[in-house]
Design a protein with these regions (language model features):
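Bacterial Sec-dependent N-terminal signal peptides
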Residues: 1-24, 308-309
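N-terminal catalytic or cofactor-binding beta/alpha core of small enzyme domains
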Residues: 23-303
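Short, conserved catalytic or adaptor-binding loops enriched in Gly and charged residues
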Residues: 253-254, 309-312
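C-terminal outer-membrane/trafficking sorting elements
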Residues: 311-393
Length: 393
């Protein structure tokens, strides 16, 4: 009997993982560029973390190229993706260049980034084409309440995150009133957010106020500039304000209606070890969830269909929070006028709780010890069967 229960749990878990983890991945020519298609209103690009070194593409020599690899930025982005999925149930759009920077620099214009090599030019076009596709899809699915992050790593001696909004270090040192003028708003990669955020925060407040992205990161123990505590970087720190990608794939470019920034990660305590990457990825996830909630009034939790926090999510079944802490109340949003029978199964396939549920009901998780469980929801009237994986911490 126990063996049958184990088999049942394994089959259900396999189904649940396959169903929930399904993600389309598209590779460009020769697998140089990778696009992991997402459903979150978040697009992340990683241009400088690759290590492919094909002999068919000569090293770039045009216009004083930079060859430095942003070490472990791909690994960091993948860990961010995993943490976002754990917390929200959905993935961001993720675009990765696997070519070494000596072969391709997507953060330069085509001439300087590919130096006339046809293979590199194809990869450059695919990289930017995938970003365009990701942001267009995100905008269409989420009513332009979207965000873009171009992920890099810096080697500056000050171990802090540098957020580039296309404003120079000297410009960030200006007064709030000056930064709030139309002149500096037009320079900014978040100018659309300034014009349309639910709390009517000013440009300066969104750059370095208590609810800026830098401050959210700092509150999660990752000092960032600009932020409330570090409002500007100073003019001697070699601060990175943002490059070609940010200028062309955010609302600084009229043809790219998405807010965003370039994020330069320090090496120590973030990129240098798997454990540090995991800690940072969780902090980033918590920060971006807070950012969307604060400025877009959008909840990323239970995200298969996103909506504003104040609206009922237009999704057939939602279970939250997930992951949860033992003792939390498990909330269910179910279709109205339909009664479901539920069973909660542990890893042995044993039913640890069961009962009936209707729209907007909840159950106590006190019976659930830390671990992985499956919630099986069934409605005999219409042969509806739903299986959801939950994690109790």
């Amino acid at each position: 009997m126990i063996a049958k229960r184990n088999l049942l749990f394994i089959l259900l878990l396999t189904f649940a993982i396959f169903y929930s983890n399904a993600q389309q991945v598209i590779f460009g020519t020769n697998n140089f560029i990778e696009y992991q298609v997402g459903t979150l209103p978040l697009v992340i690009s990683v241009p400088h973390g690759g290590n492919l070194d094909p002999s068919s593409i000569p090293n770039r020599i045009c216009n004083n190229p930079v060859y430095t690899t942003d070490e472990f930025t791909i690994e960091t982005a993948l860990e961010i993706k995993n943490k976002l999925f754990e917390l929200t149930g959905c993935y961001p759009h993720l675009i990765i260049s696997h070519l070494k920077r000596s072969k391709l620099d997507p953060n330069r214009n085509l001439a300087d980034g590919a130096c006339g090599n046809s293979e590199a030019e194809t990869a450059w076009n695919e990289f930017h084409g995938f970003i365009t596709n990701g942001r267009n899809t995100a905008n269409q699915q989420n009513n332009y309440k979207t965000f873009f992050v171009d992920l890099h790593g810096h080697g500056n001696p000050i171990q802090r995150i540098e957020l580039g909004y296309l404003l120079y270090d000297s410009e960030l040192a200006l007064s709030d009133s000056t930064l709030n003028t139309q002149q500096y708003l037009n320079y900014s990669s978040i100018k659309n957010l300034v014009l349309n955020n639910v709390n009517n925060y000013t440009h300066a407040e969104l750059l370095r106020g208590p609810y800026s992205f830098g401050t959210f990161l700092a509150n999660n123990n990752f000092p960032s500039v600009p932020s409330q505590n570090i409002p500007f970087p100073g003019t001697t720190s070699n601060y990175f304000s943002g490059g070609y990608i940010t200028a062309n794939h955010t609302c600084y470019n009229i043809g790219a209606p998405i807010n965003g920034l370039q994020m330069e990660l320090n090496y120590n305590n973030i990129r240098n070890t798997p454990a540090n990457r995991t800690v940072f990825a969780l902090a980033f996830t918590q920060s971006i969830v807070s950012y969307f909630s604060t400025h877009f009034n959008v909840s990323l939790i239970g995200c298969s269909t996103l909506s504003t926090i104040n609206d009922v999510l237009e999704k057939k079944i939602i279970i939250y929070p997930n992951p949860l802490v033992r003792g939390d109340i498990i909330h269910f949003k179910l279709p109205e006028n339909i009664e479901y029978e539920y069973q909660i199964l542990n890893t042995l396939g044993q039913i640890v709780d069961a009962g009936q549920l209707k729209h907007n009901q909840s159950i106590d998780s006190s019976k659930l010890f830390p671990g992985v469980f499956l919630i099986r929801l069934s409605n005999k009237n219409n042969n509806d069967l739903n299986i959801h994986k939950i994690i109790v911490q």
